[in-house]
């Protein structure tokens, strides 16, 4: 294994030049073997595929469910990936034949050509097997092309890893000359793309601390670069630089955020399955402990900017929006900075800011119902009728609860400043 293996997975981008090269190489393999070829990265995400070219009728078995889904959605499911990896393709250095298995959705056999570079598997070329299939000489020639694909994937990934490092340097820089230098380096790396409208997406908490588990920007719509950043005391978040068509629309960022949340959910599900298997083994051994619950994640989208100078501020906005989405389900799972209202101010407070002493008694578990009543009352601008309807209670019950809130806190709910203090304290408690 060589030292760059982690970088090969950490971040990658596809320029039009890279994309064209991949397509040409896949077409070359298709011509060599006379069958359509498909190229996927090691995470089973589609990169390129050869068109079906035949003078006869299209064989329906060439479009079995697994192949169709891969082409239409540009990726395979975790179950499909696990099934194919069971044939040893991650360790193989030569062609691997996989028999047809209709119950798995594989109606036609496959030939897998591992795509390697310096001993590291970076992807796979998939061929539909036939009878008679390709000769050994044809497969050897195709493996030569696969080696060229591996070199291209390595170059692409290393270029993308550099972008990820430059982005991270900008987002963690203290400011002043350090920030200026980091921005200049990122601007140089991006070239002409530096001056287009951008925003940042924050996905938090990202379910894995392993950089190898970060997605490739190729698979994230409109993503230019991504990197992992700390989140809270021990967690991690994912920062994604997204290019926009204009500063007036956030649609590309919302699309990217939705895709990343799906990736995060898949990672959480896989982790939960692994934890379940470990727990079952521990139970069998008589040493089972508590099973940690999987933590939900959310995404935040910062405001749009042209150029890179304000990326630090955009990251603060995206992080704040993600925190708001985690605190308030009505914002999530994807929240925009422009839409989070008072949380734009509340998220600027230190994460461990102490509770106001007047409101602290109300925030204990014993008074959860009173706190909820007060929050809904203040959310409805102190209108008793709307509040009672929202809570599904009688007005007299509402008045009784509000009087109890005043007794506990010493605050006067007829006083505007007291209302403001209570409202902000209740909202801030959601961020804790």
Task: Tell me what each language-model feature is.
Residues 18, 73, 156, 160, ...:
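Intrinsic-disorder-associated interaction segments
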Residues 55-57, 175, 352-353:
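Short, hinge-like loop/turn segments at secondary-structure boundaries
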Residues 182, 186-432:
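Cytosolic nucleotide-utilizing catalytic cores of signal-transduction proteins
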Residues 159, 166-190:
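Glycine-rich, aromatic-bearing surface loops/beta-hairpins
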Residues 77-80, 174-175, 356-357:
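Helix N-terminus capping/helix-initiation residues
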Residues 1-169, 275-288, 368, 373, ...:
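Alpha-helical/coil-rich non-catalytic "connector" segments in signaling and regulatory proteins
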């Amino acid at each position: 294994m060589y030292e760059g293996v982690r970088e090969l997975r950490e971040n990658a981008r596809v320029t039009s030049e890279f994309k064209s090269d991949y397509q040409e190489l896949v077409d070359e393999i298709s011509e060599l073997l006379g069958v359509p070829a498909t190229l996927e990265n090691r995470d089973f995400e589609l990169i390129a595929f050869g068109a079906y070219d035949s003078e006869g009728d299209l064989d329906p078995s060439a479009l079995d469910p697994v192949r169709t889904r891969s082409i239409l959605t540009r990726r395979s499911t975790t179950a499909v990936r696990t099934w194919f990896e069971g044939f040893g393709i991650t360790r193989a250095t030569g062609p691997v034949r996989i028999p047809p298995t209709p119950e798995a959705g594989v109606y036609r056999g496959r030939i897998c050509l591992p795509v390697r570079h310096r001993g590291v598997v970076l992807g796979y070329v998939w061929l539909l097997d036939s009878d008679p299939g390709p000769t050994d000489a044809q497969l050897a020639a195709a493996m030569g092309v696969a080696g060229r694909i591996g070199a291209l994937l390595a170059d692409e990934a290393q270029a993308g890893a550099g972008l990820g490092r430059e982005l991270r340097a900008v987002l963690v820089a203290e400011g002043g000359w350090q920030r200026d230098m980091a921005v200049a380096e990122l601007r140089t790396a991006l070239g002409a793309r530096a001056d287009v409208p951008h925003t940042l997406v924050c996905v938090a908490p990202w379910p894995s601390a392993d950089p190898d588990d970060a997605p490739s920007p190729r698979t994230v719509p409109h993503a230019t670069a991504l990197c992992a950043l700390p989140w809270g005391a021990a967690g991690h978040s994912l920062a994604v630089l997204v290019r926009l068509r204009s500063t007036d629309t956030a649609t590309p960022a919302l699309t990217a955020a939705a895709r990343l949340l799906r990736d995060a959910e898949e990672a959480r599900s896989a982790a939960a399955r692994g934890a379940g298997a470990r727990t079952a083994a521990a139970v069998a051994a008589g040493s089972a402990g508590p099973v940690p619950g999987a933590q939900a994640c959310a995404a935040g989208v910062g405001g749009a900017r042209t150029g890179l100078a304000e990326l630090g501020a955009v990251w603060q906005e995206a992080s704040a929006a993600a925190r708001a989405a985690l605190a308030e389900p009505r914002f999530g799972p994807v929240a925009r900075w422009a839409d989070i209202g008072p949380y734009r101010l509340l998220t600027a407070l230190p994460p461990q800011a102490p509770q106001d002493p007047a409101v602290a008694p109300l925030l204990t578990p014993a008074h959860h119902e009173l706190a909820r009543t007060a929050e809904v009352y203040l959310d409805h601008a102190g209108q008793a009728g709307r509040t009672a309807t929202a809570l599904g209670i009688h007005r007299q019950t509402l008045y009784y609860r509000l009087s109890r809130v005043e007794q506990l806190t010493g605050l006067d709910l007829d006083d505007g400043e007291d209302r403001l203090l209570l409202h902000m304290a209740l909202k801030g408690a959601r961020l804790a």
